[in-house]
Amino acid sequence: MLTFNSLQLITLISNFFWPMIRVLSFFSVAPIFKEKLINRKSKILLSGMISWLVWPFLPEVHTVLFSYFGFLLILQQILIGIVLGFTAQLLFATINLSGEIIGLQMGLSFATFFNNNSQIGTSIISRFLNILALFVFITLNMHLYLISIVIDSFYSMPIDGYFLNVNIFFILLKFSSSIFLNGLLLVLPIMIILLSISFVMSLLNRLSPQISIFSIGFPLNLILGMLMLYFLIPVMLPFLKKILDDLIFFMNNNLLHI
C-alpha cells in the first residue's frame, strides 16, 4: 500500500502545478485555443492532460509553492506562456490589419461583425481573411506545432533556476515589425489600385463637376476590390504558409534560446 505524507503530497501537486500554469497561460492567448467556443473547462482539462504527461520528465522544482519565491515563479510561468501565445497570435493580428485596410479602401468599413474575442467590431473582409488563415493554420497542423513548442520550452526555459531574459521582448518587437511588414506587402497591390481609382475619380470631378463621383466611385471600388481579392486568394495561401514557417522557425530557434 502506497502512503504519502503531507510534504510528499505538496511536492507532487506543485510539480504538476508549475507546468500547468504555463500551458494554461499559453492557451489563454494562443490562436484557436483562446477562442470562446472552447470553454474554460476544456482549456483547463487540456492543459491538465498535457501537464500530467510532461511533468514526470521535468526536473524537480525545489521552490516552495506557498512562498514569496513561489509567487514570483508563478508570475514567470504566466509571463512565459503569454509571450509564446502572443507570438503565435501575431499572424492573425497581421491578417486582421490587412483586412481592415482592404475594407477601408473598398468602402466596406461600415460592414462589420461583432468579434466576441476582442469585443469590438471587425470588418467583413478582415473576418473573411481571418477564417481563411484559420483554415490554413489547422490544415498545416500548426496547433500541434505550438503545443510541441510549449513542451520544448520546459527544457530551454526550465521552471526552476531560470530567469526570463529582458531581451526577449526586444527580439519579439523586431519580429512583430517584420510580420506586419509582410502583411502590408500582401495588401499593397490592392491599396495601389484602389488609391489610383480614387485619384482618377478626383480628376474626373475636376474635369466635369456634374458627374456624381459617389455614385460611380463606390461601386467601382467595390467591384475592383472584390476582383482583386479573387486574384489575391491563390497568392495568399503560399504566403500564409511562408509566414507560418517563419513563425515556427523563430519560436524554435530564437524565442526558446534566449
From Swiss-Prot:
Which Pfam families does the record match to this protein? Bac_export_1 (PF01311)
PANTHER family (alphabetical): FLAGELLAR BIOSYNTHETIC PROTEIN FLIR (PTHR30065:SF8)
What GO biological process, any one, is recorded here?
protein targeting
Record's GO cellular component terms: bacterial-type flagellum basal body; plasma membrane
Q: Where in the cell is it found?
A: Cell membrane; Bacterial flagellum basal body
State which residue ranges cross the membrane: 10-32, 44-66, 71-93, 128-150, 154-172, 179-201, 211-233
Ordered alphabetically, the record's keywords are:
Bacterial flagellum, Cell membrane, Membrane, Transmembrane, Transmembrane helix
- Describe the task this protein carries out: Role in flagellar biosynthesis.
Protein name, UniProt field: Flagellar biosynthetic protein FliR
Q: How does it sit in the membrane?
A: Multi-pass membrane protein
NCBIfam families, per the entry: fliR
UniProt similarity note: Belongs to the FliR/MopE/SpaR family.
Q: What is its main location?
A: membrane
Superkingdom classification of source: Bacteria
Question: Which species is this record about?
Answer: Buchnera aphidicola subsp. Acyrthosiphon pisum (strain APS) (Acyrthosiphon pisum symbiotic bacterium)
